[in-house]
Amino acid sequence: MVIGSMLTATPLSAFMARQGRRAGFIIGTMGGAIGAAIGAYGLYTSSFLLFLIGALFSGIYMSAQGFYRFAAADTASDAFRPKAISWVMAGGLLSAVVGPQLVKLTAQSMVVPFLGTYLTVVALNFLGVFLFAGLKIPKPKPPAPGAAMGRSRMELIRTPRIAVSVIVATVSYALMNLVMTSSPLAVVGCWFETKDAANVV
């Protein structure tokens, strides 16, 4: 999933710059639905390869959701912009609470463990497609001829503040993934139930 997000973040950003945030978000939710569907089929057929391919597609959604706060910043008024970004971040915190509860409700709902969870993710992503279809975000205006271009990536990464920010974000994100991936597995490995593991992180 992380690899899928890494591979699609830059192309998705470029796509949004041309076609707008709404189109990019719809692609993200479609990627999430396809990824969850492939993952569900992988579980049903006991195919680890299909499960990994599904996770790769889910990375498209993971990449797209990182742009939500930028959409809020782009469309909100100057006075409301800080609150808009805060609401988006608060939604992320809420999902961190709701998500594990959905796992508890659906993990054993079918004969194959977690199959119901993945099918629920498919349904939620399709719901997201309809919600984003009604979202009104203006497309970005094309740059004027001869307009000054921003700094190149190499120029940005040579800026000490940006370099430090990238390093700190990379390390903290890697640690978060390590904790959030290994902890539930360790809980289940200690003979606790899945519903107990869902509340640990």
Where are the regions that the model predicts?
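Cytoplasmic helix-loop-helix junction between adjacent transmembrane helices
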Residues: 52-90
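Juxtamembrane intracellular "pre-TM" segments in multi-pass secondary transporters
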Residues: 137-168
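Central cavity-lining transmembrane alpha-helices of secondary-active solute carriers
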Residues: 2-14
